[in-house]
Regions:
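Active-site environment of divalent metal-dependent phosphoester hydrolases
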Residues: 11-16, 40-43, 64-70, 129, ...
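Short acidic-hydrophobic surface loop/beta-edge motif
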Residues: 109-117, 165-167
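Anionic-ligand binding region
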Residues: 140-153, 157-178, 188-190
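Acidic, His/Gly-rich catalytic cores of divalent-metal-dependent hydrolytic chemistry
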Residues: 166-175, 179-301
Length: 301
């Protein structure tokens, strides 16, 4: 019976992707699909794209593919083009080659596996790659989301949290994240779907099981520094590096925190945010800090 591996939210994390590629090879799967967000939130997007293209794995387009393509095409507010808060996004967009961008731009929003005609794979929901399904999604919300679905099995991603949920006669699976898990487990995460040989006519014939793969996070720390991404992206790159350490969402909580304070993102808020969020010691242990040349909390490079 067929085995289908689905991975997503790689987010330019090559060491995590390489560990998952090796694990998939050991699982004897028959088909592999990438459910979006190959790039963004990390420094090696071009390398990830080349890896996936060389393997010939089918992909769908995630919201971060859209974000970086929009930056490259100038489809973003004028203020973002010089705003230090968006320096990391500009860096990531420029890191992609023309061939990378063309590949990402051609990706579909939905994919049906060759060996799973009753499965639909999307990045977020059938309606949008910027919406997500997570443990917090209510039955009423899920019912609304599934009205757009024309198959009994939905595989999605986007929230960076693995999920397996039966809803009536349907199965909803969130892959979790390869490169930036937000469930407190720093291992790279993906899912394998196995077809059940004895499923009845009205039964869901797929069984889902997540895989959790350890990888060398020290290598990721070195890549952040050696590529120049940590310096170029300012506080946003530092917050993304902290997400690698904590396996929790850090950037979005920071932006919400800043908005509530009526401030703007910048190094002057770094220490206060980390202290209030309880991540100061984690950041210190990982060597993630404001530029030492900045005496007043304002970034100086």
């Amino acid at each position: 019976m067929p085995r289908i591996a689905v991975l997503a939210d790689i987010h330019a994390n090559v060491p995590a992707l390489d560990a998952v590629i090796a694990d998939i090879a050991a699982q004897r799967v028959d088909e592999v699909v990438v459910a979006g967000d190959l790039v963004g939130r990390g420094p090696l997007g071009s390398t990830v794209v080349r890896r996936i293209r060389a393997l010939g794995w089918a992909c769908v387009r995630g919201n971060h593919e859209d974000y970086l393509l929009d930056f490259r095409a100038g489809r973003v507010p004028v203020g973002w083009r010089g705003d230090p808060a968006w320096a990391g996004a500009r860096w990531m967009a420029e890191e992609l080659s023309e061939a990378d961008a063309a590949f990402l731009d051609a990706l579909p929003l939905t994919h049906t596996p060759r060996l799973g005609s009753d499965i639909r794979i999307v990045h977020g929901t059938p309606a949008s790659n910027r919406e997500g399904i997570g443990p917090w999604t209510t039955d009423a919300q899920l019912a609304g989301i599934l009205t757009e679905l024309d198959a009994p099995v939905l595989v999605c991603a986007h929230t960076h949290r693995p999920l397996i949920r039966t809803f009536g006669a349907r199965l909803v699976v969130n892959t979790g994240s390869v490169g930036l898990p937000f469930n407190g487990d720093p291992r790279a995460q993906y899912v394998i779907l196995d077809a059940e040989p004895d499923a009845g006519d009205d039964a869901i014939r797929w069984h889902a099981e997540h895989r959790y793969v350890a990888y060398d996070r020290d290598q990721v720390r070195r890549i952040y520094r050696e590529t120049g991404f940590l310096e170029a992206g300012g506080i946003v790159s530092a917050l993304l590096a902290l997400e690698i350490e904590t396996a929790r969402s850090v950037l979005v909580p920071y932006l919400v925190w800043i908005e509530k304070r009526g401030g703007t993102p910048g190094w002057s808020t770094w220490s206060t945010f980390l202290d209030e969020a309880g991540w100061a010691e984690t950041a210190r242990a990982a060597g993630i800090h404001a530029p030492r040349s900045s005496a007043n909390g304002i970034e100086e490079h």
